[in-house]
């Protein structure tokens, strides 16, 4: 009886906004209408089990019974939604027939920003980067539909049937009422919205590439804000133009040649039209394509395997740099195998950088002491092709050894092509220079002995006072100090440039063997100082840009992790 009483309470809710409850008492329908079509009304609803807002699609049976085709469309949509699961296809939750109220009810996920058409008209000033992002998501949904066995054709793709969550730009294809499973090689029936229908649809002989034509028209609508063929007064005029191969007038208003070319690819005759899978590879849609400010490509985040070390380690892997490197190997002598150790001051905290080369790869280990217990380390590995791997990790002074951390790093991050001992030597060299009492667990005396001697002598060298001083050591050469305002540690992708820039500074501004050098002229000194200032200005400019990109990458990764946890 208690359950019955609860049910009665739910069926007659005190909230005046709640108009209806589903048979399982899980979903409640509000009176707020969020969409309306010829036969279907969409209400805002709430899932009381998962605590999320959903869409309650309701169709009156009396309305669809007047048109048997509409009833079949409705059942077709329910069947398809139940079977499809993809990030860019609207998600189905439940459906039922209410005999008492004579309605068919479908619960789907809710899109707070409505249709893409409505959203685009509301936000008219949107960068092409966002439009490309929407296009990629639509194509990924189409690739999924067309990749089914047998393929599924949407047949009514338009911005009205594509939905968006504006808070994070998620786009999904919906309204599958006209979709069909292509049992034969070609479908036969004529159906869809005339403005978006491919020419072959009128000939009743088409396949899934008809959706690509519609997608092209969606792109046209997204960039012009108008329905294709809005110059036509009726469907007959549209049919006449489409069958004659006349493109919409709005296509001539697309000024960006790349955008126009991409749309035209989608509107080619069916025999020449590319598939969704092929269009996703088009240069126009590539993530690293040119945008307004030509950003640097973002690194991919590589998560370590599960384990204790994985909790304090992260690797990002970037593509080869597009900027030529002229100074990458100038001051790293692979034959001597001796490292370069650099000291700098970062807001009162001492930073140390160790650089070393091995078999065409260049290693840069940077460290900054957090407190008495731990040191923040960043290892950059730059291969001969310019690809950069960046490993961020914490080193605990009590309990950690260079060999232990190096072994775990190579195993967890699958750095199979790197030598454990080589990385351990880098770590111990840095720690010996940072912590005077540090006890190494690998032999590094042969690598640091001459450096320590040079370090004691370098304090006698005269140099102009600067905001920051770096003392650089290299095998038999004693190098005098020079200024460098770069902070340590630096950001991910920028480090590749920063390594190159630092090496350029070393070559151009550091005098070589003490007894073999001659005094530098004032003009030469001024030229070198200007060169350093130019490098620093360029560095600061790039750092500002990469910091923004890094933040975006971190936020995107966090979002993906959150979505994975929800699944």
Swiss-Prot record:
Q: InterPro entries annotated for this entry? A: Kinase-like_dom_sf, Prot_kinase_dom, Ser/Thr_kinase_AS, WNK_Ser-Thr_kinase
Give the compositionally biased regions (Basic and acidic residues): 499-509
Residue span of region Disordered: 499-528
User: Which cysteines form disulfides?
Assistant: none
Q: What induces it?
A: Expressed with a circadian rhythm showing a peak before dawn.
| Domain Protein kinase, residue spans | 28-285
Active site residues of this protein: 175 (proton acceptor)
Residue ranges with Acidic residues bias: 512-525
E.C. number(s) listed in UniProt: 2.7.11.1
**What does the record list as coiled-coil region(s)?**
519-553
Give a yes or no for keyword Protein transport in this entry: no
What Pfam families does UniProt report for this protein, alphabetically? Pkinase
Q: Which UniProt keywords apply?
A: ATP-binding, Coiled coil, Kinase, Nucleotide-binding, Serine/threonine-protein kinase, Transferase
Q: Name one GO molecular function term.
A: ATP binding
Binding annotation for ATP: 108-111, 158
Superkingdom of source = Eukaryota
Class of the enzyme per the UniProt entry, highest EC level? transferase
Q: What reaction gets catalysed by this protein?
A: L-seryl-[protein] + ATP = O-phospho-L-seryl-[protein] + ADP + H(+); L-threonyl-[protein] + ATP = O-phospho-L-threonyl-[protein] + ADP + H(+)
UniProt GO BP:
protein phosphorylation
What's this chain's function? May regulate flowering time by modulating the photoperiod pathway.
Q: Which family does it belong to?
A: Belongs to the protein kinase superfamily. Ser/Thr protein kinase family. WNK subfamily.
**What's the protein name?**
Probable serine/threonine-protein kinase WNK6
Organism equals Arabidopsis thaliana (Mouse-ear cress)
């Amino acid at each position: 009886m208690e359950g019955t009483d609860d049910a009665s309470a739910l069926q007659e809710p005190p909230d005046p906004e709640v108009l209806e409850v589903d048979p399982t008492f899980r979903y409640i329908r509000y009176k707020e209408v969020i969409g309306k079509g010829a036969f279907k009304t969409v209400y805002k609803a709430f899932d009381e089990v998962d605590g999320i807002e959903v869409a309650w699609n309701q169709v009156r049976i009396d309305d669809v019974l007047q048109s048997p085709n509409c009833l079949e469309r409705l059942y077709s949509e329910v069947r398809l939604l139940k079977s499809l699961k993809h990030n860019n296809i609207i998600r189905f939750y439940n459906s039922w027939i209410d005999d008492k109220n004579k309605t068919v009810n479908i619960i789907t996920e809710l899109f707070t920003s409505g249709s893409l058409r409505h959203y685009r008209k509301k936000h008219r000033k949107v960068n092409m980067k966002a439009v490309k992002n929407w296009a990629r998501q639509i194509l990924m949904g189409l690739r999924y539909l067309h990749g089914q066995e047998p393929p599924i054709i949407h047949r009514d793709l338009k911005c009205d049937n594509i939905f968006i969550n504006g808070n994070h730009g998620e786009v999904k294809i919906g309204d599958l009422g006209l979709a069909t499973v292509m049992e034969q090689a070609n479908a036969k029936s004529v159906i869809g919205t005339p403005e978006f229908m491919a020419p072959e649809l009128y000939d009743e002989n088409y396949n899934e590439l008809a959706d690509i034509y519609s997608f092209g028209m969606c792109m046209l609508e997204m960039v012009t804000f108008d329905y294709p063929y809005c110059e036509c007064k009726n469907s007959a005029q549209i049919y006449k133009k489409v069958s004659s191969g006349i493109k919409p007038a709005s296509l001539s208003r697309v000024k960006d040649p790349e955008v126009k070319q991409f749309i035209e690819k989608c509107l080619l005759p069916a025999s020449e039209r590319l598939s969704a899978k092929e269009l996703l590879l088009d240069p126009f849609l590539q993530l690293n394509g040119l945008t307004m400010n030509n950003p640097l490509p973002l690194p991919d985040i590589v998560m370590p395997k599960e384990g204790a070390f994985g909790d304090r380690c992260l690797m990002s892997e970037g593509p080869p740099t597009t900027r030529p490197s002229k100074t990458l190997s100038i001051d790293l002598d692979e034959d001597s195998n001796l490292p370069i150790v650099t000291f700098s001051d970062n807001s009162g905290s001492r930073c140390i950088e160790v650089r070393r080369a091995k078999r065409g790869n260049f290693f840069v280990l940077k460290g900054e002491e957090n407190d008495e217990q731990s040191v923040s380390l960043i290892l950059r590995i730059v291969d001969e092709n310019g690809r950069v791997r960046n490993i961020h990790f914490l080193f605990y002074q009590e309990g950690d050894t260079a060999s232990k951390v190096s072994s775990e790093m190579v195993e967890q991050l699958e750095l199979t092509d790197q030598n454990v001992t080589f990385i351990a030597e880098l770590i111990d060299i840095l720690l010996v220079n940072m912590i005077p009492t540090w006890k190494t667990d690998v032999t590094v005396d042969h690598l640091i002995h001459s450096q320590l001697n040079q370090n004691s002598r370098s304090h006698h060298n005269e140099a102009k006072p600067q905001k920051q001083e770096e003392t650089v050591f290299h095998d038999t050469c004693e190098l005098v100090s020079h200024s460098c305002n770069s902070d340590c540690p630096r950001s991910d992708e920028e480090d590749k440039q920063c390594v190159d820039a630092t090496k350029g500074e070393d070559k151009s501004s550091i005098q070589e063997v003490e007894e073999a050098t001659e005094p530098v002229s004032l003009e030469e000194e001024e030229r070198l100082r200007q060169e350093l200032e130019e490098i620093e200005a360029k560095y600061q400019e790039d750092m500002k840009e990469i910091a923004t990109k890094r933040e975006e990458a971190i936020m995107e990764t966090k979002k993906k992790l959150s979505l994975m946890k929800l699944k």
